[in-house]
Amino acid sequence: SYYEATGDETVFSPEVKKAFRRILDTWKTEQHHDNESSYYFRRINCPPTDTLSNDGKGEPTAYTGMTWSGFRPSDDACVYGYLIPSNMLASVILGNIAEIAREIYNDEKLAEEADAFSEEVRNAIETLAILPAQKTEYYAYEVDGFGQYLVMDDANLPSLLAIPYYGYCDNKNERYQNTRKVILSDQNPYYFSGECAKGIGSPHTYTRFIWPMALAMQGLTSDSMEEKLKMLERIAACDAGTDLVHESFHVDHPDDFTRPWFSWANSVFCELVLDYCGQKVTL
């Protein structure tokens, strides 16, 4: 985080503390989305993924301890309201809020509340986001609390692939490794293999289009220098001669791509370059 990297406490004004309070209150309300939340989103004359069903409230959910999401990082509507990567990130962020509350604001009450909330979300994930009756335990992408699960991953961040990147667990965690194997395979309906590349795409873009951002994240979450280099080379070879990283490209025809300039993907690619170079120096 910025604070961990710089030690700069000046950014933590009273307004930021109020924002922390608003985050906790909002997420707690959305733990009970169906009964307590006033949020809805309705849009007409649009694809189904651009609006929420059930008169704007989304599909029904049961209480789990997780917090509800209407939309994914891709801006597509969730199928089931508990988006697991986002809840994992929320658990991490709540821990960060607790740390700042103690160290900067000297507010032990807020810190304890954030810590307890973080643990509640994590316990719900570890209890209810694991696919039942499988030989190995791995995480679903979305659940609804009624027993419905969605097995997939989306290139947009946060994702299941990126779990170690945002600090929910390390990349040696058994459930993460099991999940990684699933989402980097045909078990993920948005994993595509072609003549030029293979990787994770998104329902937000076309079939058989994969996202360089997911390739970069595959490298960033690997300990293998060989895999990191392979992802760098794959991204560079599929830039359609533009010297830029695109949103997505066709696995058979990389010159067929979306967004000629996608700064999010360019940034994650650059981070992988730095990560790879840094490790090479260490080695």
Model-identified regions with their sequence ranges:
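Aromatic-rich carbohydrate-recognition surfaces in CAZymes
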Residues: 1-51, 262-277
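Membrane-embedded hairpin module used as a gating/binding unit in multi-pass transport
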Residues: 93-99
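Extended ligand-binding clefts on enzyme/binding-domain cores
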Residues: 24-91, 103-104, 112-211
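Substrate-binding groove/exosite segments of carbohydrate-active enzymes
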Residues: 1-4, 82, 163, 216
